[in-house]
Protein backbone atom coordinates (compact mmCIF):
# COMPACT_ATOMS: atom_id res chain seq x y z
CA UNK A 1 0.00 0.00 0.00
CA UNK A 2 1.40 3.40 -0.93
CA UNK A 3 0.28 6.95 -0.41
CA UNK A 4 1.02 10.15 -2.35
CA UNK A 5 3.56 12.54 -0.92
CA UNK A 6 5.54 10.11 1.15
CA UNK A 7 3.41 7.06 1.88
CA UNK A 8 4.83 3.98 3.49
CA UNK A 9 6.54 1.77 0.95
CA UNK A 10 8.12 -0.87 3.11
CA UNK A 11 7.36 -4.35 1.82
CA UNK A 12 8.37 -5.85 5.10
CA UNK A 13 5.59 -3.94 6.82
CA UNK A 14 3.09 -5.24 4.30
CA UNK A 15 4.07 -8.81 4.96
CA UNK A 16 4.00 -8.44 8.73
CA UNK A 17 1.12 -6.23 9.91
CA UNK A 18 1.54 -4.51 13.27
CA UNK A 19 0.47 -6.71 16.10
CA UNK A 20 -2.22 -5.58 18.48
CA UNK A 21 -1.05 -5.74 22.09
CA UNK A 22 -3.07 -7.44 24.73
CA UNK A 23 -5.93 -5.34 26.05
CA UNK A 24 -4.81 -5.67 29.60
CA UNK A 25 -1.31 -4.36 28.85
CA UNK A 26 -1.71 -1.60 26.25
CA UNK A 27 1.62 0.04 27.04
CA UNK A 28 3.98 -2.71 26.01
CA UNK A 29 4.37 -3.12 22.25
CA UNK A 30 2.56 -0.30 20.43
CA UNK A 31 5.24 2.41 20.76
CA UNK A 32 7.91 0.15 19.34
CA UNK A 33 5.71 -0.83 16.43
CA UNK A 34 4.96 2.79 15.68
CA UNK A 35 8.65 3.59 15.87
CA UNK A 36 9.40 0.90 13.32
CA UNK A 37 6.63 2.02 11.01
CA UNK A 38 7.41 5.74 11.02
CA UNK A 39 10.37 6.76 8.90
CA UNK A 40 12.31 9.85 9.87
CA UNK A 41 13.52 11.04 6.53
CA UNK A 42 10.48 12.44 4.74
CA UNK A 43 9.77 15.55 6.74
CA UNK A 44 9.11 18.10 3.98
CA UNK A 45 7.18 16.03 1.45
CA UNK A 46 3.59 17.20 1.86
CA UNK A 47 1.76 20.25 3.08
CA UNK A 48 -1.57 18.58 3.69
CA UNK A 49 -3.06 15.22 4.45
CA UNK A 50 -3.84 13.01 1.51
CA UNK A 51 -4.62 9.33 1.73
CA UNK A 52 -4.76 6.82 -1.07
CA UNK A 53 -8.36 6.03 -1.99
CA UNK A 54 -9.50 2.54 -1.28
CA UNK A 55 -8.78 0.18 -4.18
CA UNK A 56 -9.96 -3.33 -4.79
CA UNK A 57 -7.45 -6.02 -3.87
CA UNK A 58 -7.12 -9.62 -4.59
CA UNK A 59 -7.84 -12.36 -2.14
CA UNK A 60 -4.15 -12.62 -1.41
CA UNK A 61 -4.09 -9.09 -0.25
CA UNK A 62 -7.02 -9.38 2.13
CA UNK A 63 -4.67 -9.86 5.04
CA UNK A 64 -2.86 -6.67 4.10
CA UNK A 65 -6.14 -4.74 4.06
CA UNK A 66 -6.96 -6.10 7.45
CA UNK A 67 -3.81 -4.58 8.82
CA UNK A 68 -3.79 -1.30 6.91
CA UNK A 69 -7.54 -0.75 6.64
CA UNK A 70 -8.00 0.01 10.33
CA UNK A 71 -5.56 2.91 10.29
CA UNK A 72 -3.17 4.57 7.90
CA UNK A 73 -0.26 6.98 7.84
CA UNK A 74 -0.84 10.62 6.94
CA UNK A 75 2.35 12.58 6.18
CA UNK A 76 2.58 16.11 7.49
CA UNK A 77 5.59 18.32 6.99
CA UNK A 78 7.45 19.43 10.10
CA UNK A 79 7.45 23.20 10.51
CA UNK A 80 5.08 23.91 7.63
CA UNK A 81 2.67 26.80 7.76
CA UNK A 82 -0.35 24.52 7.56
CA UNK A 83 -1.52 22.02 10.13
CA UNK A 84 -4.27 19.45 9.89
CA UNK A 85 -6.83 19.64 12.70
CA UNK A 86 -9.03 16.60 13.20
CA UNK A 87 -10.41 17.00 16.72
CA UNK A 88 -9.61 19.06 19.81
CA UNK A 89 -8.32 16.88 22.54
CA UNK A 90 -5.35 14.87 21.34
CA UNK A 91 -2.04 15.98 19.89
CA UNK A 92 -0.09 13.69 17.61
CA UNK A 93 3.60 13.72 16.75
CA UNK A 94 4.87 14.87 13.42
CA UNK A 95 6.11 14.33 10.74
CA UNK A 96 3.88 11.24 10.21
CA UNK A 97 0.61 10.95 12.05
CA UNK A 98 -1.60 7.88 12.47
CA UNK A 99 -5.11 8.87 11.39
CA UNK A 100 -8.23 6.89 12.07
CA UNK A 101 -10.05 6.07 8.85
CA UNK A 102 -13.20 7.95 7.85
CA UNK A 103 -14.18 5.64 4.97
CA UNK A 104 -16.36 3.30 7.00
CA UNK A 105 -13.68 0.65 7.43
CA UNK A 106 -13.92 -1.89 10.21
CA UNK A 107 -12.68 -0.57 13.55
CA UNK A 108 -11.23 -2.82 16.17
CA UNK A 109 -11.44 -1.86 19.83
CA UNK A 110 -8.09 -3.32 20.69
CA UNK A 111 -6.45 -1.37 17.87
CA UNK A 112 -8.02 1.84 19.15
CA UNK A 113 -6.82 1.14 22.67
CA UNK A 114 -3.33 0.37 21.42
CA UNK A 115 -3.31 3.53 19.33
CA UNK A 116 -4.33 5.65 22.32
CA UNK A 117 -1.60 4.01 24.36
CA UNK A 118 0.96 4.87 21.72
CA UNK A 119 -0.14 8.51 21.70
CA UNK A 120 0.20 8.76 25.49
CA UNK A 121 3.87 7.72 25.32
CA UNK A 122 4.87 10.08 22.51
CA UNK A 123 6.41 13.53 23.18
CA UNK A 124 3.53 15.55 21.79
CA UNK A 125 2.41 19.13 22.27
CA UNK A 126 -0.76 21.02 21.52
CA UNK A 127 1.04 22.84 18.73
CA UNK A 128 0.84 19.64 16.69
CA UNK A 129 -2.39 18.46 15.17
CA UNK A 130 -5.32 17.06 17.15
CA UNK A 131 -7.49 14.06 16.39
CA UNK A 132 -11.25 13.87 16.06
CA UNK A 133 -13.22 10.75 16.84
CA UNK A 134 -16.65 10.47 15.34
CA UNK A 135 -19.58 9.64 17.57
CA UNK A 136 -19.67 6.14 16.15
CA UNK A 137 -15.95 5.64 16.77
CA UNK A 138 -16.25 6.96 20.30
CA UNK A 139 -19.12 4.59 21.00
CA UNK A 140 -17.00 1.61 20.08
CA UNK A 141 -14.64 2.36 22.96
CA UNK A 142 -15.57 0.89 26.31
CA UNK A 143 -15.76 2.97 29.48
CA UNK A 144 -12.15 2.25 30.49
CA UNK A 145 -10.80 3.27 27.09
CA UNK A 146 -12.87 6.47 27.08
CA UNK A 147 -11.51 7.46 30.50
CA UNK A 148 -8.01 6.60 29.36
CA UNK A 149 -8.48 8.78 26.26
CA UNK A 150 -9.55 11.73 28.43
CA UNK A 151 -6.61 11.23 30.80
CA UNK A 152 -4.17 11.29 27.89
CA UNK A 153 -5.63 14.53 26.55
CA UNK A 154 -5.63 16.21 29.95
CA UNK A 155 -2.00 15.32 30.59
CA UNK A 156 -0.81 16.44 27.17
CA UNK A 157 -2.90 19.58 26.77
CA UNK A 158 -3.46 20.63 30.37
CA UNK A 159 -7.14 21.21 29.66
CA UNK A 160 -10.27 19.19 30.27
CA UNK A 161 -11.82 18.99 26.84
CA UNK A 162 -14.53 16.45 27.59
CA UNK A 163 -15.89 14.28 24.80
CA UNK A 164 -13.92 14.56 21.56
CA UNK A 165 -16.85 14.35 19.19
CA UNK A 166 -19.04 17.20 20.46
CA UNK A 167 -18.76 20.36 22.49
CA UNK A 168 -18.31 19.79 26.22
CA UNK A 169 -21.46 20.35 28.20
CA UNK A 170 -19.69 22.84 30.45
CA UNK A 171 -18.02 24.84 27.70
CA UNK A 172 -18.66 28.59 28.05
CA UNK A 173 -19.47 30.97 25.28
CA UNK A 174 -16.33 31.39 23.24
CA UNK A 175 -16.67 34.50 21.16
CA UNK A 176 -15.54 34.00 17.63
CA UNK A 177 -12.42 35.98 16.89
CA UNK A 178 -10.83 36.40 13.54
CA UNK A 179 -10.59 38.86 10.72
CA UNK A 180 -10.49 38.22 7.03
CA UNK A 181 -8.26 40.29 4.78
CA UNK A 182 -10.67 40.25 1.86
CA UNK A 183 -14.13 39.17 0.82
CA UNK A 184 -12.86 36.33 -1.34
CA UNK A 185 -10.57 35.02 1.38
CA UNK A 186 -13.35 35.28 3.93
CA UNK A 187 -15.69 33.30 1.71
CA UNK A 188 -13.08 30.62 1.13
CA UNK A 189 -12.23 30.29 4.80
CA UNK A 190 -15.88 30.11 5.75
CA UNK A 191 -16.44 27.36 3.22
CA UNK A 192 -13.54 25.33 4.52
CA UNK A 193 -14.50 25.71 8.17
CA UNK A 194 -18.16 25.02 7.56
CA UNK A 195 -17.28 21.53 6.48
CA UNK A 196 -14.83 21.10 9.30
CA UNK A 197 -17.31 22.04 12.02
CA UNK A 198 -19.62 19.20 11.04
CA UNK A 199 -17.35 16.65 12.67
CA UNK A 200 -14.31 15.54 10.69
CA UNK A 201 -11.88 16.93 8.17
CA UNK A 202 -12.15 15.38 4.76
CA UNK A 203 -9.16 13.60 3.29
CA UNK A 204 -6.93 15.99 1.39
CA UNK A 205 -8.55 19.12 2.87
CA UNK A 206 -6.30 22.06 3.72
CA UNK A 207 -6.59 23.75 7.09
CA UNK A 208 -5.36 27.30 7.72
CA UNK A 209 -2.96 27.91 10.60
CA UNK A 210 -4.64 31.20 11.50
CA UNK A 211 -7.77 29.29 12.44
CA UNK A 212 -5.82 26.79 14.50
CA UNK A 213 -4.71 29.69 16.68
CA UNK A 214 -8.33 30.07 17.77
CA UNK A 215 -7.73 27.16 20.13
CA UNK A 216 -6.17 29.72 22.42
CA UNK A 217 -9.56 31.30 23.08
CA UNK A 218 -9.80 29.90 26.57
CA UNK A 219 -12.34 31.60 28.82
CA UNK A 220 -12.69 31.20 32.59
CA UNK A 221 -16.09 30.89 34.17
CA UNK A 222 -17.57 30.10 37.56
CA UNK A 223 -19.94 27.20 38.07
CA UNK A 224 -22.90 27.29 40.38
CA UNK A 225 -20.85 25.38 42.95
CA UNK A 226 -18.37 28.26 43.01
CA UNK A 227 -15.54 26.45 41.25
CA UNK A 228 -13.64 28.21 38.50
CA UNK A 229 -13.16 26.10 35.40
CA UNK A 230 -11.56 26.76 32.06
CA UNK A 231 -13.26 26.06 28.79
CA UNK A 232 -12.12 26.11 25.19
CA UNK A 233 -14.02 26.04 21.93
CA UNK A 234 -14.75 22.48 20.91
CA UNK A 235 -12.74 23.07 17.79
CA UNK A 236 -10.94 25.96 16.22
CA UNK A 237 -13.36 25.81 13.31
CA UNK A 238 -16.22 26.92 15.52
CA UNK A 239 -14.29 29.94 16.74
CA UNK A 240 -13.48 30.93 13.18
CA UNK A 241 -17.09 30.45 12.09
CA UNK A 242 -18.22 32.70 14.91
CA UNK A 243 -20.09 29.92 16.66
CA UNK A 244 -19.88 29.42 20.38
CA UNK A 245 -20.68 26.73 22.86
CA UNK A 246 -23.03 27.68 25.63
CA UNK A 247 -23.94 25.90 28.84
CA UNK A 248 -25.97 22.75 28.64
CA UNK A 249 -29.73 23.00 28.66
CA UNK A 250 -32.23 20.57 30.11
CA UNK A 251 -32.38 18.67 26.87
CA UNK A 252 -28.66 17.91 27.07
CA UNK A 253 -27.82 19.79 23.88
CA UNK A 254 -25.48 22.78 24.02
CA UNK A 255 -26.86 26.15 23.11
CA UNK A 256 -25.54 27.69 19.91
CA UNK A 257 -26.27 31.42 19.70
CA UNK A 258 -25.91 32.89 16.25
CA UNK A 259 -22.75 34.92 15.89
CA UNK A 260 -21.01 36.24 12.85
CA UNK A 261 -17.32 37.02 12.37
CA UNK A 262 -18.18 40.66 11.64
CA UNK A 263 -19.73 41.12 15.07
CA UNK A 264 -16.88 39.45 16.90
CA UNK A 265 -14.04 41.47 18.41
CA UNK A 266 -10.62 41.29 16.75
CA UNK A 267 -8.39 38.39 17.64
CA UNK A 268 -5.33 39.27 19.73
CA UNK A 269 -1.96 37.85 18.90
CA UNK A 270 -1.88 34.12 19.72
CA UNK A 271 1.58 34.51 21.20
CA UNK A 272 0.49 37.08 23.78
CA UNK A 273 -0.78 35.60 27.07
CA UNK A 274 -4.26 36.67 28.00
CA UNK A 275 -5.15 37.41 31.61
CA UNK A 276 -8.59 36.97 33.06
CA UNK A 277 -9.68 38.25 36.43
CA UNK A 278 -12.26 36.30 38.40
CA UNK A 279 -13.83 38.33 41.22
CA UNK A 280 -13.27 36.89 44.66
CA UNK A 281 -16.18 35.26 46.40
CA UNK A 282 -17.48 37.46 49.27
CA UNK A 283 -17.64 36.10 52.78
CA UNK A 284 -20.78 34.96 54.51
CA UNK A 285 -21.51 38.49 55.69
CA UNK A 286 -21.47 39.77 52.16
CA UNK A 287 -24.06 37.44 50.70
CA UNK A 288 -26.15 38.85 47.94
CA UNK A 289 -23.22 40.26 46.03
CA UNK A 290 -24.21 41.05 42.46
CA UNK A 291 -23.39 38.45 39.88
CA UNK A 292 -23.41 38.98 36.16
CA UNK A 293 -24.40 36.15 33.89
CA UNK A 294 -25.87 32.75 34.61
CA UNK A 295 -22.60 31.36 35.91
CA UNK A 296 -21.84 34.31 38.21
CA UNK A 297 -18.73 35.70 36.51
CA UNK A 298 -18.68 39.48 36.36
CA UNK A 299 -17.91 40.85 32.90
CA UNK A 300 -14.67 42.67 32.29
CA UNK A 301 -16.46 46.01 32.25
CA UNK A 302 -17.85 45.40 35.75
CA UNK A 303 -14.58 44.31 37.35
CA UNK A 304 -13.22 47.03 39.62
CA UNK A 305 -16.24 49.30 39.13
CA UNK A 306 -17.89 50.83 42.22
CA UNK A 307 -21.41 51.11 40.90
CA UNK A 308 -23.19 51.19 44.29
CA UNK A 309 -23.06 54.63 45.92
CA UNK A 310 -24.31 55.90 49.24
CA UNK A 311 -27.02 58.51 48.87
CA UNK A 312 -25.84 60.48 51.92
CA UNK A 313 -22.05 60.64 51.61
CA UNK A 314 -21.50 59.49 48.02
CA UNK A 315 -19.05 56.72 48.91
CA UNK A 316 -18.85 53.96 46.28
CA UNK A 317 -18.83 50.18 46.72
CA UNK A 318 -18.35 47.22 44.42
CA UNK A 319 -20.96 45.05 46.13
CA UNK A 320 -24.48 45.90 47.22
CA UNK A 321 -23.98 44.12 50.55
CA UNK A 322 -21.11 46.49 51.36
CA UNK A 323 -23.42 49.44 50.73
CA UNK A 324 -26.06 47.96 53.04
CA UNK A 325 -23.47 47.56 55.81
CA UNK A 326 -22.20 51.10 55.26
CA UNK A 327 -25.68 52.60 55.55
CA UNK A 328 -25.83 51.40 59.15
CA UNK A 329 -23.17 53.98 60.03
CA UNK A 330 -25.66 56.69 59.07
CA UNK A 331 -28.80 55.11 60.52
CA UNK A 332 -27.16 53.77 63.68
CA UNK A 333 -28.73 50.36 63.16
CA UNK A 334 -27.04 47.53 65.07
CA UNK A 335 -28.81 44.26 64.25
CA UNK A 336 -26.29 41.91 65.89
CA UNK A 337 -26.75 41.61 69.67
CA UNK A 338 -24.59 39.78 72.18
CA UNK A 339 -26.55 37.12 74.06
CA UNK A 340 -24.42 37.54 77.21
CA UNK A 341 -24.37 41.29 77.81
CA UNK A 342 -26.85 42.59 75.23
CA UNK A 343 -24.35 44.86 73.50
CA UNK A 344 -25.22 45.42 69.85
CA UNK A 345 -23.04 45.71 66.78
CA UNK A 346 -23.46 46.76 63.18
CA UNK A 347 -21.41 43.87 61.78
CA UNK A 348 -21.44 40.20 62.61
CA UNK A 349 -17.64 40.11 62.59
CA UNK A 350 -17.57 42.71 65.37
CA UNK A 351 -19.95 40.59 67.42
CA UNK A 352 -17.71 37.55 67.02
CA UNK A 353 -14.72 39.54 68.22
CA UNK A 354 -16.69 40.82 71.18
CA UNK A 355 -17.83 37.37 72.29
CA UNK A 356 -14.21 36.37 72.93
CA UNK A 357 -14.30 38.72 75.93
CA UNK A 358 -16.96 36.57 77.61
CA UNK A 359 -15.29 33.26 76.86
CA UNK A 360 -11.95 34.47 78.22
CA UNK A 361 -10.08 32.96 75.30
CA UNK A 362 -6.73 34.57 74.55
CA UNK A 363 -5.20 32.71 71.61
CA UNK A 364 -2.63 35.36 70.66
CA UNK A 365 0.60 35.29 72.70
CA UNK A 366 3.47 37.76 72.57
CA UNK A 367 6.71 35.88 71.83
CA UNK A 368 8.75 38.45 73.78
CA UNK A 369 6.95 38.54 77.14
CA UNK A 370 4.47 35.65 76.72
CA UNK A 371 1.53 37.92 77.44
CA UNK A 372 -1.71 36.73 75.83
CA UNK A 373 -4.42 38.69 74.07
CA UNK A 374 -7.88 37.94 72.78
CA UNK A 375 -7.45 39.84 69.49
CA UNK A 376 -4.66 39.83 66.97
CA UNK A 377 -4.83 43.61 66.55
CA UNK A 378 -4.25 44.04 70.29
CA UNK A 379 -1.17 41.84 70.06
CA UNK A 380 0.21 43.97 67.22
CA UNK A 381 -0.28 47.13 69.28
CA UNK A 382 1.38 45.49 72.27
CA UNK A 383 4.42 44.41 70.27
CA UNK A 384 5.12 48.07 69.48
CA UNK A 385 6.05 48.47 73.14
CA UNK A 386 8.96 46.09 72.60
CA UNK A 387 9.98 47.46 69.22
CA UNK A 388 9.43 51.13 70.12
CA UNK A 389 7.50 51.69 66.90
CA UNK A 390 5.19 54.70 66.85
CA UNK A 391 3.59 54.87 63.41
CA UNK A 392 0.97 57.54 64.19
CA UNK A 393 2.27 61.12 64.01
CA UNK A 394 0.47 64.32 64.91
CA UNK A 395 0.50 66.68 61.94
CA UNK A 396 0.69 69.75 64.21
CA UNK A 397 3.33 68.99 66.82
CA UNK A 398 4.94 65.89 65.26
CA UNK A 399 4.35 63.87 68.42
CA UNK A 400 4.21 60.14 67.74
CA UNK A 401 1.93 57.46 69.17
CA UNK A 402 1.71 53.70 69.09
CA UNK A 403 -2.08 53.66 68.78
CA UNK A 404 -4.39 55.54 66.50
CA UNK A 405 -6.85 56.14 69.32
CA UNK A 406 -4.12 57.88 71.32
CA UNK A 407 -3.44 60.16 68.37
CA UNK A 408 -7.11 61.07 68.07
CA UNK A 409 -7.22 61.87 71.78
CA UNK A 410 -4.10 63.98 71.50
CA UNK A 411 -5.43 65.94 68.54
CA UNK A 412 -8.30 67.07 70.75
CA UNK A 413 -5.80 69.10 72.77
CA UNK A 414 -5.03 71.17 69.66
CA UNK A 415 -8.59 71.67 68.48
CA UNK A 416 -10.25 71.76 71.89
CA UNK A 417 -13.12 69.73 70.48
CA UNK A 418 -15.15 67.68 72.94
CA UNK A 419 -17.87 66.07 70.87
CA UNK A 420 -19.12 63.63 73.51
CA UNK A 421 -21.55 65.32 75.89
CA UNK A 422 -23.11 63.87 79.00
CA UNK A 423 -26.92 64.13 78.74
CA UNK A 424 -27.29 64.48 82.54
CA UNK A 425 -24.77 67.14 83.54
CA UNK A 426 -23.83 68.41 80.05
CA UNK A 427 -20.14 67.77 80.68
CA UNK A 428 -18.18 67.18 77.50
CA UNK A 429 -15.39 64.75 76.74
CA UNK A 430 -12.99 64.15 73.91
CA UNK A 431 -13.53 60.36 73.88
CA UNK A 432 -16.65 58.26 74.04
CA UNK A 433 -14.98 55.87 76.48
CA UNK A 434 -14.40 58.77 78.87
CA UNK A 435 -18.08 59.64 78.61
CA UNK A 436 -19.10 56.06 79.42
CA UNK A 437 -16.83 56.05 82.46
CA UNK A 438 -18.23 59.40 83.58
CA UNK A 439 -21.84 58.25 83.31
CA UNK A 440 -21.13 55.58 85.91
CA UNK A 441 -20.80 58.36 88.46
CA UNK A 442 -24.46 59.18 87.83
CA UNK A 443 -25.75 55.63 87.69
CA UNK A 444 -23.48 54.25 90.44
CA UNK A 445 -22.57 51.19 88.36
CA UNK A 446 -19.31 49.52 89.40
CA UNK A 447 -18.88 46.54 87.07
CA UNK A 448 -15.32 45.62 88.10
CA UNK A 449 -15.21 43.67 91.40
CA UNK A 450 -12.02 42.61 93.14
CA UNK A 451 -11.75 38.80 93.28
CA UNK A 452 -9.86 39.00 96.61
CA UNK A 453 -11.92 41.36 98.76
CA UNK A 454 -15.03 41.90 96.64
CA UNK A 455 -14.59 45.66 96.40
CA UNK A 456 -16.06 47.08 93.20
CA UNK A 457 -14.77 49.81 90.95
CA UNK A 458 -16.20 51.84 88.13
CA UNK A 459 -13.04 51.69 86.05
CA UNK A 460 -10.90 48.74 85.14
CA UNK A 461 -7.71 50.71 85.70
CA UNK A 462 -8.75 51.33 89.30
CA UNK A 463 -9.27 47.61 89.82
CA UNK A 464 -5.81 46.85 88.42
CA UNK A 465 -4.26 49.42 90.73
CA UNK A 466 -6.22 48.03 93.68
CA UNK A 467 -5.03 44.48 93.01
CA UNK A 468 -1.46 45.63 93.67
CA UNK A 469 -2.37 46.23 97.29
CA UNK A 470 -2.99 42.49 97.58
CA UNK A 471 0.02 41.36 95.57
CA UNK A 472 2.44 44.02 96.83
CA UNK A 473 3.62 44.75 93.31
CA UNK A 474 5.33 48.11 92.75
CA UNK A 475 6.16 48.36 89.05
CA UNK A 476 6.97 52.11 88.97
CA UNK A 477 10.56 53.00 89.94
CA UNK A 478 12.14 56.39 90.49
CA UNK A 479 15.24 56.85 88.34
CA UNK A 480 16.80 59.30 90.85
CA UNK A 481 16.56 57.38 94.13
CA UNK A 482 15.29 53.96 93.04
CA UNK A 483 12.17 54.12 95.20
CA UNK A 484 9.23 52.05 93.88
CA UNK A 485 5.53 52.80 93.80
CA UNK A 486 2.37 50.88 93.03
CA UNK A 487 0.72 53.78 91.16
CA UNK A 488 2.14 55.92 88.39
CA UNK A 489 0.58 59.02 89.95
CA UNK A 490 2.56 58.40 93.15
CA UNK A 491 5.77 58.22 91.13
CA UNK A 492 4.94 61.48 89.36
CA UNK A 493 4.30 63.26 92.66
CA UNK A 494 7.50 61.83 94.15
CA UNK A 495 9.62 63.06 91.25
CA UNK A 496 8.57 66.66 92.07
CA UNK A 497 10.47 66.43 95.32
CA UNK A 498 13.68 65.95 93.34
CA UNK A 499 12.92 68.77 90.94
CA UNK A 500 11.43 71.20 93.47
CA UNK A 501 8.26 71.70 91.47
CA UNK A 502 5.20 72.81 93.49
CA UNK A 503 2.35 73.42 91.12
CA UNK A 504 -0.46 73.61 93.73
CA UNK A 505 -0.78 77.03 95.49
CA UNK A 506 -3.20 78.12 98.23
CA UNK A 507 -5.49 80.91 97.01
CA UNK A 508 -5.71 82.46 100.54
CA UNK A 509 -2.11 82.62 101.67
CA UNK A 510 -0.24 81.73 98.48
CA UNK A 511 1.63 78.76 99.93
CA UNK A 512 2.61 76.13 97.30
CA UNK A 513 2.65 72.36 97.44
CA UNK A 514 3.92 69.50 95.27
CA UNK A 515 0.79 67.37 95.74
CA UNK A 516 -2.85 68.23 95.48
CA UNK A 517 -3.63 66.25 98.62
CA UNK A 518 -1.26 68.45 100.62
CA UNK A 519 -3.05 71.55 99.34
CA UNK A 520 -6.43 70.17 100.44
CA UNK A 521 -5.02 69.44 103.88
CA UNK A 522 -3.68 73.00 104.10
CA UNK A 523 -6.98 74.60 103.10
CA UNK A 524 -8.65 73.17 106.19
CA UNK A 525 -6.50 75.48 108.29
CA UNK A 526 -8.31 78.44 106.83
CA UNK A 527 -11.78 77.00 107.39
CA UNK A 528 -11.70 75.00 110.69
CA UNK A 529 -9.70 74.64 113.92
CA UNK A 530 -8.20 77.20 116.37
CA UNK A 531 -5.94 78.64 113.75
CA UNK A 532 -8.89 79.26 111.54
CA UNK A 533 -10.69 81.05 114.44
CA UNK A 534 -7.65 83.24 115.12
CA UNK A 535 -7.43 84.06 111.47
CA UNK A 536 -11.08 84.99 111.45
CA UNK A 537 -10.62 87.27 114.47
CA UNK A 538 -7.61 88.94 112.97
CA UNK A 539 -9.46 89.32 109.78
CA UNK A 540 -12.46 90.87 111.51
CA UNK A 541 -10.27 93.27 113.49
CA UNK A 542 -8.50 94.27 110.37
CA UNK A 543 -11.77 94.75 108.62
CA UNK A 544 -13.15 96.83 111.54
CA UNK A 545 -10.10 99.01 111.61
CA UNK A 546 -10.49 99.69 107.99
CA UNK A 547 -14.19 100.36 108.39
CA UNK A 548 -13.81 102.81 111.41
CA UNK A 549 -13.36 106.34 110.12
CA UNK A 550 -10.42 108.26 111.53
CA UNK A 551 -11.12 110.84 114.34
CA UNK A 552 -11.70 114.42 113.32
CA UNK A 553 -8.80 116.81 113.91
CA UNK A 554 -9.13 119.32 116.69
UniProtKB/Swiss-Prot annotation:
GO biological process: negative regulation of transcription by RNA polymerase II; positive regulation of hydrogen peroxide biosynthetic process; positive regulation of mitochondrial outer membrane permeabilization involved in apoptotic signaling pathway; regulation of DNA-templated transcription; regulation of transcription by RNA polymerase II
Subcellular location per the Swiss-Prot or TrEMBL entry: Nucleus
Annotated zinc fingers (C2H2-type), start-end: 308-330, 336-358, 364-386, 392-414, 420-442, 448-470, 476-498, 504-526
Cited PROSITE patterns: KRAB, ZINC_FINGER_C2H2_1, ZINC_FINGER_C2H2_2
Residue span of region Disordered: 1-74, 173-195, 240-303
Keyword Manganese: no
Modification Phosphoserine occurs at: 292
Key words of the record: DNA-binding, Isopeptide bond, Metal-binding, Nucleus, Phosphoprotein, Repeat, Transcription, Transcription regulation, Ubl conjugation, Zinc, Zinc-finger
InterPro entries, alphabetized: KRAB (IPR001909), KRAB_dom_sf (IPR036051), Zinc_finger (IPR050331), Znf_C2H2_sf (IPR036236), Znf_C2H2_type (IPR013087)
Annotated GO CC locations: mitochondrion; nucleus
Xref: SUPFAM superfamilies: beta-beta-alpha zinc fingers, KRAB domain (Kruppel-associated box)
A molecular function (GO) term: DNA-binding transcription repressor activity, RNA polymerase II-specific
Composition skew (Basic and acidic residues), residue ranges: 11-30, 45-58, 274-289
Stated role: Transcriptional repressor involved in regulating MPV17L expression. By regulating MPV17L expression, contributes to the regulation of genes involved in H(2)O(2) metabolism and the mitochondrial apoptotic cascade.
Domain-level remarks: The KRAB domain is required for transcriptional repression.
Family the UniProt entry places it in: Belongs to the krueppel C2H2-type zinc-finger protein family.
Protein's name in the database: Transcriptional repressor RHIT
Amino acid sequence: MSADGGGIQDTQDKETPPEVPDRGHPHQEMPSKLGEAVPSGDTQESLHIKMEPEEPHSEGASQEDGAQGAWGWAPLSHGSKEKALFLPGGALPSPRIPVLSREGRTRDRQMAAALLTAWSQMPVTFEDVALYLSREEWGRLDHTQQNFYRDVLQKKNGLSLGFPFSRPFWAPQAHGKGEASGSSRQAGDEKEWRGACTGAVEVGQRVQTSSVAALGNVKPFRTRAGRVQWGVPQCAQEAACGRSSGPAKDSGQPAEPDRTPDAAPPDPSPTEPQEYRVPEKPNEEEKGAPESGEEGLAPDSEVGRKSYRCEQCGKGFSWHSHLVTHRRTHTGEKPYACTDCGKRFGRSSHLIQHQIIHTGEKPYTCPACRKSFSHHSTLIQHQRIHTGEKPYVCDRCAKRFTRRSDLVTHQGTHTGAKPHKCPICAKCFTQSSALVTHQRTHTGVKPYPCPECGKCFSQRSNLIAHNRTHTGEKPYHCLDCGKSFSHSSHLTAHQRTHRGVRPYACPLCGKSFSRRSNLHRHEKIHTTGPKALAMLMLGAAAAGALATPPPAPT
